């Protein structure tokens, strides 16, 4: 029998917080449009389900993704404490993806190599942190400085890999890599590049190629 009791509770929690969620979305989009212009976005809200319970929990109660330059999906579990504080960050992260969707060819997920994915996620996280610097996401502290260096030494030779399952294992964690390795490395890589090039606007660096961002960073492949 499917677990409908838990799902009903999640849906009820979303309905209870409907106005709060709507207001958060409105304010966040206003913040986002102050740096990058992207109008007429549609944001879909859905309940977390049993299959997604693990990743939603690991992400603090919200798992989000972008499915085009105008569509963002938010999967929410209001039963996880602190989710509302992460909502603006999650929206801003996906907003940057939506802005970059066509320019960076984000729609071709299966054709992206590891460098594309790491830099794309790093850019989105950096943008969200520009808007909400006090918000801490799980992957912000997933790796220590030493851990970042060590994992980079392991994956830097794989930057051109287009193996989808290998990339997913690096990004989210697997038997071979700690949880959120790719996200942690991506954010630190982009952060190191943009701190050294602070004059670049969000519009400018959003449109820079992954290869150039890597070249600008303190991360070296040799």
Residue ranges and their predicted role:
Residues 19-23, 85-86, 90, 114-118, ...:
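Soluble non-cytosolic domains of exported or imported proteins
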Residues 82, 104-114, 133-140, 196-201:
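Inter-helical turn/loop segments and adjacent helix faces that build the functional surface
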Residues 111-151, 220-222:
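Post-HExxH zinc-binding segment in Zn-dependent metallohydrolases
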Residues 156-222:
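Pan-zinc metallopeptidase signature
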Residues 1-11:
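N-terminal accessory alpha/beta regions
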Residues 10-69:
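Auxiliary, metal-adjacent structural segments of Zn-dependent hydrolase domains
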Residues 89-103, 121, 125:
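Active-site recognition of the HExxH zinc-binding catalytic motif
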Residues 75-91:
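Short pre-active-site segment immediately N-terminal to the catalytic Zn-binding motif
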């Amino acid at each position: 029998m499917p677990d409908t009791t838990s799902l009903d509770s999640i849906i009820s929690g979303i309905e209870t917080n409907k106005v709060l969620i709507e207001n958060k979305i409105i304010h966040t989009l206003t913040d986002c449009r102050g740096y990058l212009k992207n109008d007429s976005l549609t944001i879909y809200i859905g309940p977390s389900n049993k299959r997604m319970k693990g990743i939603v929990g690991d992400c603090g109660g919200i798992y989000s993704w972008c499915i085009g330059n105008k569509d963002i999906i938010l999967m929410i579990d209001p039963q996880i404490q602190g989710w509302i504080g992460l909502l603006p960050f999650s929206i801003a992260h996906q907003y940057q993806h939506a802005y970059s969707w066509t320019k960076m060819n984000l729609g071709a997920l299966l054709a992206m190599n590891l460098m594309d994915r790491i830099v794309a996620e790093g850019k989105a996280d950096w943008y969200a942190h520009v808007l909400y610097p006090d918000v801490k996401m799980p992957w912000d502290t997933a790796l220590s400085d030493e851990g970042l260096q060590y994992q980079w030494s392991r994956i830097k030779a794989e930057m051109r890999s287009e193996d989808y399952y290998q990339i997913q294992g690096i990004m989210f964690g697997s038997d071979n890599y700690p949880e959120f390795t790719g996200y942690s490395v991506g954010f630190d890589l982009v952060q190191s590049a943009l701190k050294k090039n602070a004059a670049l606007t969000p519009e400018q660096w959003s449109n820079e190629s992954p290869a150039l961002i890597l070249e600008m960073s303190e991360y070296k492949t040799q």
